[in-house]
């Protein structure tokens, strides 16, 4: 049983990182740089906080979306609960920034919330699917 959750964590992490990297590579210069560029670090990002975010967020995806899907045997459980998790987490981040920062655009808020919803839902579903392909559905 624990092996299934370890595989699930790894599979979900790979799915999340792969999908998110496509978005970040394409939207960094199209969305974030033009809209909130003055808030961003020049030449990259801090690796430590990024790794901590990924490790803990994927754990949250396992607890709230992929784990329940592994118990129910339904990918739709992972997709729905993952999408809801993504919506609430990204909404909290974006609306807090929108409310407290001088430079934060409505465009970034809306697109980032939509992205977080899609990303977390789809990565949860893919993580569930990969796990069941590797470990079976018992």
Language-model region placement:
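Juxtamembrane/disordered regions of integral membrane proteins
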Residues: 1-115, 119-138
């Amino acid at each position: 049983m624990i092996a299934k959750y370890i595989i699930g964590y790894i599979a979900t992490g790979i799915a999340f990182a792969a999908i998110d990297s496509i978005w970040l590579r394409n939207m960094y210069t199209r969305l974030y740089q033009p809209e909130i560029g003055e808030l961003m670090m020049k030449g990259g990002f801090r690796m430590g906080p990024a790794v901590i975010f990924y490790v803990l967020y994927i754990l949250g995806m396992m607890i709230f979306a992929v784990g329940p899907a592994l118990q129910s045997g339904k990918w739709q459980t992972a997709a729905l609960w993952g999408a809801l998790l993504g919506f609430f987490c990204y909404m909290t981040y974006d609306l807090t920034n929108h409310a407290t920062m001088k430079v934060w655009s409505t465009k970034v808020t809306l697109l980032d919330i939509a992205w977080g919803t899609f990303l977390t839902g789809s990565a949860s579903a893919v993580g569930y699917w990969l796990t069941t392909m590797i470990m079976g559905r018992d």
